[in-house]
Amino acid sequence: MNQSAGAAQHTHRYSVEEKDIGPVGPDRNWKGIGISLLVILVVLSFIGLSIVLLSKDTGSKTSGSPLTLDDLFQRSFQIHDPDAKWISAKEIIFQRWDGNVFKMDMNNNKTELLLKNTTFATFKASKFAISPDLNFVLLGYDVKQVHRHSFLASYLIYNLYTREVQELNPPEVSNSALQFASWGVQGQQLIYIFENNIYYKANVQSSSWRLTSSGQDGVVFNGITDWLYEMEVLHHQAAHWWSPDGSRLAYLTINDSLVPTMFLPRFTGSLYPRGTEYRYPKMGQNNPAVGLHVITLDGSSFTEEIKPPDGFHTRELYITMVKWVAQEKLSVRWVNRAQNMSVLSLCDTTAGSCITKHVMVSDKWLDGQNEKPVFSRDSTAFFTIMPLKHSSHGAFNHIAMISNHSSGKDVSLHHLTSGTWDVTHILSYDESTNSVFFLSTEEGPSQQHLYRVSVMDSSDKECLSCSLFRSNCTYYDAALSSDCQHVLLNCRGPGLPQTTLHKLSSMREFQTLDESAELRAALKNRRVPKTERRTVQINSFAFRLELILPMDLDETQKHPLLLVLWESVLVSSEHIIVARVDGRGSSFQGEEILYGVHQRLGTVDAQDQTTALEQLLKLPYIDESKVGVYGKAYGGFLSTVLLLSHNSRFRCGIAVAPITDWRLYGSACSEKYFGFPAKEEYKYQISSLVGITATQPQELFIIHGTEDATVHFQHSAELVKLLSSLNVNYTLQIFPDEGHTLSSHSQQFMLSSVMAFYKRCFQEKNTVALETSKEDD
């Protein structure tokens, strides 16, 4: 779906006041590092370490009531995303906090109500998408989550003018639960996916046309992802792409027939336990076979298969990016299974032939392979992100322009940007001004701003967002209009989120679509944490450090704020300090730091956290006898390593859905960091928890849902078996039939247990809680 309606989902963010602290190591600008956890995860991509410490001063000298767990689940404390989208060069649609959906026209600055909030209540709909011709809306209801991005839902087609309603179902099927449904790019084009086959409607009144017939439940997927492609490769549900004029549809066929099956038991609600099976490849096992097809939507059903480059086998490759470049041209990125070589192809969809435009190789792994290149109109030149070596800090990601000479054979390559910072996204190329628009971290590793650079003169570069809302926003997402005249800026922190619309020629002229007024009001009388930022010198590296400290929100000053996360309750009400250290494995600090964990997870990353903790314990306001650790998934793995290692400084720790053995995790992730088990079995062994020998009386709290499809309960079962053999005490809290992301009620219960655990641990012997990586749930 293009947009989602109703109240925004609970988002992991917290409120802070920003305060810069002088660096311990080399001078850097860390302003704005305290952005939301969601943004931190995007920025760091792998590691986001937090240490929770107890302050020696337990007396409150601040006003305002502390944050509570109940606050976290109130709508007024949650972020609202207006989900603004361009529907033409001069028009956007967006949704306000009250649920009403509007269209804004840049030509006359008028805003028109398209869809009332009462419509969602009438049809019990929670998702929506508006047709390109603005006549119809697709309403999704009875939504049932499958994995992180995928869901089943039933759909209605609602006429915005006559208010007539019709169900969207495959032929001869009623009350269907569809795997996907959305509009095309022209008029009322519509596709939906049922039982892993793609259906097409040329318009609302036309009959459905089944485009594929090979779909098999849980085995062959057409136009949507299986578990591996959804969670580890494409990172979304859809696996199809419209041509610009809507005349063709490219789609993946993912065949899991040889992929081993994982069983997820369901214990409650029946006399005997039931369960579901799904295909889940682990390291060294068969991966899905994948094929790319293009079908013509003129009624002929002509389908062309796009073949991979020579040397790539369908089961030993990933298709990580597909993008239409012109009406008949498609760019595709093919990555080998080891993820250390990629080929960017430009394909003629009428003939099925491709030419190689660029090849990348690495002796570790290749990062950012989902990033889409930007082509010129004639496809002779394109812009992509490539590593550029820096003399002292390793390589950083920068914009490279690659073009063919007049002969069509010789290729030139030159970088438009350089420095010890990363380009994160290339947004657009404006040929009328020879300008490339992009997002980068030039202002600091935890900042992201909008920039423009000239293709003719790379020294002609400017930051378009750096001077906007300085006290509130240092991390932006951006979406440019198709004519590169306007931009939607989504401020993600460190202050309250807001969405604004700007003219690129005059960025200070803007309209605000959403400024989180409800959240601002909710936080007005709450005791909101503040942050301090430092750098920590560890060996030859200078790592980022963030401390979240108890402090009241001064209502007479304009403090940057972040949204509420559960640690904020600890900080606000229990005088506990949260610390995060971005050690080896984190992004935007050069490839030397990023690749430092290659084949060494649980070793050098744990060393970085331990060394950082030793420096933290020297601070006068931290009680060194009260230190704990928290983490989920990879963070649960790392927190367990830190807690149970020899001479650990941690008193207690929590591991939520911990990865305990990388051989048990998904193939794409495990093989990326460790390689193939036949060659690297020893690397897998030293990075598992089987080597733990600690018998100290630390307190370990393990939390896991039994129906977790991402990190299976098998991991916690192996950990419990190991701890029992070592006579190490532990507490286990399971959530029957719950997945990797808990339901709202279970999440609230879990967080209450987490809070009680830390309070008990810290009260027993003057104790800190360290939080390792958390995911963007």
Residue ranges and their predicted role:
Residues M1-H486, R492-P497, V768, S773-D777:
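Beta-propeller folds
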Residues V143, Y161, H405, M551, ...:
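Short beta-to-alpha linker loops that shape the active-site pocket of alpha/beta-hydrolase fold enzymes
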Residues S214-I224, S516-V641, S645, T660-D661, ...:
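Cap/lid segment of the alpha/beta-hydrolase catalytic domain
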Residues D363-W365, P387-S391, V423-T424, T441-E442, ...:
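Short, contiguous acidic/charged loop-to-helix segments that flank catalytic cores in large enzymes
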Residues E567, G596, D608, C652, ...:
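Mobile cap/lid helix-loop segments that gate and shape the active-site cleft of serine hydrolases
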Residues V629-G631, V656, I703:
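Short beta-strand immediately N-terminal to the catalytic nucleophile in serine-hydrolase-like folds
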Residues Q696, I702-H704, D708:
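Short beta-strand/loop motif that positions the catalytic acidic residue
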Residues F701, Q714-D777:
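C-terminal catalytic histidine-bearing segment of alpha/beta-hydrolase fold enzymes
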